[in-house]
């Protein structure tokens, strides 16, 4: 993988679902903010040449880092939604990032992406006409619930995947799609959805389950366990 890419990390969320007074991306994990692990995991790949972190307006928790692993680390202010923050980050990328360049978008609270998974995403995504996302096939049995909470049926899972990040797409296509979705009042839940709305079909690249997102306190405990295994 020789093509250099920038990564956009939306980190303007307040972590309301987590239930902490501190946004979860800044929660201390073994003495360091959670987001530091995320940034280091991305910067560890030689093809990642810079990172753009999108923070909330007036964010006092951000420590004004300017580099990670010797790579430039820039910041900009985000929006009310994740999609708005991603758009802000894409528009704020430096001039060295061209319209047709591939860009990674990665959750700030997903600190455990494996270098091997990142490598496979970049290899497959940059060779694909649209791009690619990391994902995990659904392996559990899925039940459809009725309005009263009882089971209405069982859903086939053979072609269902759980979307993870990073997600890799061309900058111009993401910008255009996010702008159109905002104008149409569409709630965007991930970058692949932006491509789908343009009639495009991104590639699914399977990754490890350990690339989970920190959403609950139990997830944080799980990540601390993963860190202990590295020692």
Curated annotation (Swiss-Prot):
Coiled coil: none
UniProt keyword list: Isoprene biosynthesis, Nucleotidyltransferase, Transferase
Gene Ontology BP terms: isopentenyl diphosphate biosynthetic process, methylerythritol 4-phosphate pathway
Catalysed reaction, written as an equation: 2-C-methyl-D-erythritol 4-phosphate + CTP + H(+) = 4-CDP-2-C-methyl-D-erythritol + diphosphate
GO molecular function: 2-C-methyl-D-erythritol 4-phosphate cytidylyltransferase activity
Family the UniProt entry places it in: Belongs to the IspD/TarI cytidylyltransferase family. IspD subfamily.
Name of the molecule in the record: 2-C-methyl-D-erythritol 4-phosphate cytidylyltransferase
Organism: Xylella fastidiosa (strain 9a5c)
Lineage of the organism: Bacteria, Pseudomonadati, Pseudomonadota, Gammaproteobacteria, Lysobacterales
């Amino acid at each position: 993988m020789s093509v250099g890419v920038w990564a956009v990390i939306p980190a303007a969320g307040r972590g309301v679902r987590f239930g902490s007074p501190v946004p979860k991306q800044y929660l201390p994990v073994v003495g360091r903010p959670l987001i530091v692990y995320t940034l280091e995991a991305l910067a560890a790949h030689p093809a990642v040449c810079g990172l753009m972190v999108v923070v909330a307006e007036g964010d006092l928790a951000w420590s004004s880092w300017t580099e990670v692993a010797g790579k430039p680390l820039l910041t900009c202010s985000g929006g009310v939604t994740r999609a708005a923050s991603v758009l802000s980050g894409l528009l704020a990328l430096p001039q060295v990032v061209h319209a047709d360049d591939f860009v990674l978008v990665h959750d700030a609270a997903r600190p455990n992406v494996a270098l091997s998974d990142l490598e496979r995403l970049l290899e497959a995504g940059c060779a694909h006409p649209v791009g690619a996302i990391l994902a995990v096939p659904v392996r559990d049995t899925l039940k459809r619930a009725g309005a009263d909470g009882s089971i209405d049926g069982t859903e086939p899972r053979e072609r269902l995947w759980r979307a993870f990040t990073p997600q890799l797409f061309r900058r111009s296509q993401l910008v255009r799609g996010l702008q159109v979705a905002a104008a149409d009042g569409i709630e965007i839940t991930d970058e692949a959805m932006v491509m789908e709305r343009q009639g495009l079909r991104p590639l699914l690249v399977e990754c490890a389950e350990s690339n989970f997102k920190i959403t609950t306190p139990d997830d944080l405990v799980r990540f601390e366990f993963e860190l202990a295994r590295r020692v």
